[in-house]
Structure formats: structure tokens, C-alpha cells
Amino acid sequence: MKKILVLNGPNLNLLGTREPEQYGRDTLADVERLCQEAGAKHGVEIECRQSNHEGVLIDWIHEAGREVAAGHMLGVVMNPGAYTHTSIALHDAIKGASVPLIELHISNVHAREEFRHHSYISPAARGIIVGLGVKGYVLAIAALVP
């Protein structure tokens, strides 16, 4: 069974309590359960990981690139959190690993503060899902399934 890696970046471990007016009341555990259900529906294995550390996320993207190249993985769904707006290193990792990646944001970043309007990740992503809440994870998983 092929796999999809779901990566959540900094502060997403606080889902459910951090700014619920922006992100809703679903916890990270709720999101991971939703992703597992979506994976089962599409016949793919889902692996969920979260880190507040840029280097860890980069290492996981490199690992995913090797898994994709070996034919074991379909790609990555990633909510890069605030690294969206700051991390050229994540952009370079995605490009360098040649990993199909769907960038995902729970909130509509374009309707928020000006600094959130630019993404370093988007030019390296296969697609982007923004502002659809946690249901965006389900759509992102479906987008990677052939």
C-alpha cells in the first residue's frame, strides 16, 4: 500500500486551543484521525508528523523524496504554519527532493495580516488549499491519489 505523509509545522500542536476563531476547535489528534479516515477511503496509508523545528521538517521532506523515488510514497500534504512566510530552506528542500507536495492552510491566509500573504512554499508545491478548515486535509489527500 502506498503512503502519503502529512506534515504539520510550528504551533499546529496547539490546534483546538490556539486562536480558535482562526483555526477552529479541532485538535491535532482530530486532524490526524480525519486524515487516517481519508486515507482508508482512498486505500493509502497515512503517516502524520508534527514538528516546531525547521530542520526536522526538512529532514522529513528529504526522506519523503527518497520514498517517492522508490515508489513507496505518493507525496506529502504539508501545513507549514508560519514557516510558509519565512522558509526558503523548506522551499529548497521540496524542490531538491522532487516530492509532490500539497501546501495546506486551515485559515485563509490572504484574509489575514499582510505578512501572511506571501508563501515561499507555494512555488515549490503541486497545489495549494487555503481557508477550508480542517476539511482541506481531506481534499489534499485526495489530490495526491492517482
Curated annotation (Swiss-Prot):
Annotated metabolic or biological route of this protein: Metabolic intermediate biosynthesis; chorismate biosynthesis; chorismate from D-erythrose 4-phosphate and phosphoenolpyruvate: step 3/7
InterPro entries assigned to the protein according to its UniProt record, in alphabetical order: DHquinase_II, DHquinase_II_CS, DHquinase_II_sf
EC assignment: 4.2.1.10
Active site: 23, 105
Example GO BP: quinate catabolic process
Keyword set, alphabetical order: Amino-acid biosynthesis, Aromatic amino acid biosynthesis, Lyase
Sites marked Transition state stabilizer: 18
Catalytic reactions on record: 3-dehydroquinate = 3-dehydroshikimate + H2O
A Gene Ontology molecular function term of the record: 3-dehydroquinate dehydratase activity
Top class in the EC scheme: lyase
Disulphide bridges: none
Sequence positions that bind substrate: 79, 85, 92, 106-107, 116
HAMAP family the record matches: AroQ
UniProt function note: Catalyzes a trans-dehydration via an enolate intermediate.
Similarity-based family: Belongs to the type-II 3-dehydroquinase family.
Assembly and oligomerization: Homododecamer.
Protein name stated in the entry: 3-dehydroquinate dehydratase
Gene of this entry: aroQ
